[in-house]
Amino acid sequence: MDAFGDYVWPRATSELILLPVTGLECVGDRLLAGEGPDLLVYNLDFGGHLRMVKRVQNLLGHYLIHGFRVQPEPKGDLDSEAMIAVFGSKGLRVVKISWGQSHLRELWRSGLWNMSDWIWDARWLEGNVALALGHNSVVLYDPVIGCMLQDVPCTDRCTLSSACLIGDTWKELTIVAGAVSNELLVWYPATALPDNKPVAPDRRVSGHVGVIFSMSYLESKGLLATASEDRSVRIWKVGDLRVPGGRVQNIGHCFGHSARVWQVKLLENYLISAGEDCVCLVWSHEGEILQAFRGHQGRGIRAIAAHERQTWVITGGDDSGIRLWHLVGRGYPGLGVSSLSFKSPSRPGALKAVTLAGSWRVLAVTDVGGLYLYDLEVKCWEQLLEDNRFQSYCLLEAAPGPEGFGLCALANGEGLVKVVPINTPTAAVDQNLFQGKVHSLSWALRGYEELLLLASGPGGVVACLEISAAPTGKAIFVKERCRYLLPPSKQRWHTCSAFLPPGDFLVCGDRRGSVLLFPARPCLFKKPGVGPKAITAAEAPQAGSSSGGSESVVTGLGPVSSLHSLHGKQGVTSVTCHGGYVYSTGRDGSYYQLFVHGGRLQPVLRQKACRGMNWIAGLRMAPDGSMVVLGFHANEFVVWSPRSHEKLHIVNCGGGHRSWAFSDTEAAMAFAYLKDGDVMLYRALGGCIRPNVILREGLHGREITCVKRVGTVTLGPEFEVPNLEHPDSLEPGSEGPGLIDIVITGSEDTTVCVLALPTTTGAAHALTAVCNHISSVRALAVWGVGTPGGPQDSHPGLTAQVVSAGGRAEMHCFSLMITPDASTPSRLACHIMHLSSHRLDEYWDRQRNRHRMIKVDPETRYMSLAICELDSDRPGLGPGPLVAAACSDGAVRLFLLQDSGRILHLLAETFHHKRCVLKVHSFTHEAPNQRRRLILCSAATDGSIAFWDLTTAMDRGSTTLEPPAHPGLPYQMGTPCLTVQAHSCGVNSLHTLPTPEGHHLVASGSEDGSLHVFTLAVKMPELEEADGEAELVPQLCVLDEYSVPCAHAAHVTGIKILSPKLMVSASIDQRLTFWRLGNGEPTFMNSTVYHVPDVADMDCWPVNPEFGHRCALAGQGLEVYNWYD
């Protein structure tokens, strides 16, 4: 200690873990969940709030929790306290817990018992615990004195893949073992002789053609269920297994999963199974699928539990999410699909179109011009009118609103539009709008104040009709307000429309895929030079004219703003205005969030629906503020929730190339469509939303490849962040609101997630996810961190620009704004705006002489990013930083960000390394009376680190950047200033830190587990030479150089120099290690074992002097550590 003086060694403690949920168990109205070695306790009291009561950290040491077994109470009362055996991997610990309504207290804890074999199952036997071990043996353990009482092996010492213990005493204990030979072995440990000789199996049961992963026994009915690698679930009639020699009969072979089945559980009336396909299926005991729960992401559902009294199923997934689902009986009241039996001799003609007026009235029109109404309360068809002018071609649309405002509109091929009051069809009003075919109809509603009907005619002319009702309510008035003109295209008609609040603009989508903004009232744009251009019939000869009009009247107003072909050539399917944003959907499988600023449409974010849903038909906003997506997945109509990643409703309708309609209210939702010449109706009570509860949001479905801290948000006392634990159990000084760190993560699942990590609650809140990438996200970079309103008018919150990059040589730039919002669980609202994107193959496709160039490898991956902040007065480049990218094709590429990230341009590249570049990092060198130098370092798979002077390269007229061989190609960066051979193999981590002496510490970690630390000196001439002289290139040299060959046992994937005397490193060996610097070779200080496997990235940052540092480790999960300096 004397050698270290008064320096205090940092001790890292785990603050937060987000890992796959591997164990679940219901105890009364509480849920026990195992996440890594931690125990999570949730309160499932449905009369109050569903919330976490307690997190017991590090209960199983370095083992993962796989199961819980609660000791039965003679009185059956587990509401006050319980004795729980927690097991997983090779560890067992017994803990006694006292719990109340909103608190939990640990009364007693046994020592951690380390077994020599894997524990597959545990069972309480009269105060002792029996364990089924991995090589077909059973041990009896006394948890109080901590000793083994019995150890009985089976004669067949095969490796097990699962086991189930049955019985309440040692004498009747039965083990059903799932062997790797795909057999079930039933044997009885108590039949062993006094010398504990191996016991022979009583029965061998075969049937599965794959390894058996899970089994469940229902004693009351004598049933055994097994889940297997062969993607099936089998139900066996076994009777009382505690009696030897019984007969085993296979009574059910259930196929419903598309991948391996991990878990199975038998209930009194149901069978629950969950697997690698992220689906939880509810079966009857006869093998019929009753329900299917989909919502988890990633590689499967790892744990299931059931609360039979409340009829809930609880699932824990690989995405670290926990969800509750209603079982049938308390479940989702779907009424299914029914035929409305339209075909009748009294109703001639064939059906042409169908629509819904609210959720309980169906409208249909036939090819003889008959309009019919079906009332779901009366349950019969009624003819409203018949008009032979609509017999060959007819469009039908009902007005929006809860019950359609009692209006519908018909249009034919001769320019005629008929507006029909449903309750008084004799009061219908005809409008002859065009001298040709009406291509489309749509309604636009502004509250209960304004109702418009838009009709598209020949030549791209859209007639806007204003609909109003007479004071008596028995008549309607139809008045043409104005006409719009769509941009030229082959299929020139609009497809949808909506009012933009407060009602000055109309947003329309057209068949070409464009989103257009029109004035709702032309009188608003009467000032010269303002608004849309008025186009006359002479300027648009194909537009046609209104009946009784002349050729000199205004035919159409052009859009004030447009986003051309936003959704591709398949067209826009819907536009919706909500919360100050415009949402558009299309048949390109995406939906856009748009913003109108200064009368201009601006794209904010592009999102994708679930995989395979290429036809998105619309969006609906739920009462709880969430959004659901309507669309077609092959021949199915699907209602999908982006929040829960769940298909809420699935209707096998045959696809979207037919007449269909959807209506949604809080009371019910309805979907009507034509099939086999009849009207089919799917109806479900309760609206779109399915009654499930997300106890904890999932993070990523695949491995997390990168993590980056953005900044910190400070909330005032009015934004109280909810604590996970009861206030009595919190440490002093941790009450109330505090600092919230904003962290972004990228994953193999192609998403970028924004997380809020409060410093006082030990929680993680997923704010939003960005799904723009088409392949995995490998690297993240942050720049321009500030506050909303800027430095002049600062507001609480955080703003930043983020660059993400990964597979398929794809890069995206988006802006991030975090603001306080008391209505959300995290007390924060996150706003994302997509700014720009870049792909190397698209860049190649845009080149005119691309036939002379070699096309970039489409499998190129961006491995790492670094922001290079140039001086703001750089001539010729304009404002904006450079982004350096390490590429798998051996290149280091420089991209220029301009216009606050809205322009992303490839500027220069170099293939100096000639092999995969793994890391890039940038730093600045500042010295008195000298220019600020920007230096980039890059590291490759050969262990070399190259240093580049970007300041000289970016100077106007500099010859450091060599001109390209062909116009349009990027510049070449030339040769580096210095190359250091730091390692013998790939460099996976790299960091630098300036020293007080004016030098730079450079640290790197390699694939061979070694560390390399050296001091880099940057030497420059004392005086800058004038323009026109020879360029000044800095001289870089290494002063001190040290290596630690065996610092870690595996790849070093994260390294950070915290100070000139302290460094921290992380590795795949799951060690977070601190090193002392400054006295020669780095000296080991201490190491902490973390629980995230395959760590791919690490980021560390100081919080404040009172809280110290925080460190985020990302891999197959996320773990946050903190330590005090």
Swiss-Prot record:
Tissue and organ distribution: Expressed in hypothalamus, hippocampus, cerebrum cortex and cerebellum.
Coarse class of the protein's main subcellular location: cytoplasm
Protein name: tRNA (34-2'-O)-methyltransferase regulator WDR6
PROSITE patterns: WD_REPEATS_1, WD_REPEATS_2, WD_REPEATS_REGION
GO molecular function: enzyme regulator activity; insulin receptor substrate binding; tRNA binding
UniProt repeat feature WD, residue ranges: 89-130, 155-197, 207-246, 256-294, 295-335, 346-384, 433-475, 489-528, 567-605, 611-650, 652-692, 725-765, 767-798, 860-905, 912-958, 982-1024, 1047-1085
Keywords, in A-Z order: Acetylation, Cell cycle, Cytoplasm, Repeat, tRNA processing, WD repeat
Any one GO CC term of the record: protein-containing complex
Keyword Cytoplasm (UniProt): yes
Residues where N-acetylmethionine is found: 1
Organism: Rattus norvegicus (Rat)
Source taxon at top rank: Eukaryota
GO BP of this protein: G1 to G0 transition; insulin receptor signaling pathway; insulin-like growth factor receptor signaling pathway; negative regulation of autophagy; negative regulation of cell population proliferation; tRNA methylation; wobble position ribose methylation
Induction conditions: Down-regulated by caloric restriction. Up-regulated by insulin and IGF1.
Keyword Acetylation listed: yes
Subcellular location: Cytoplasm
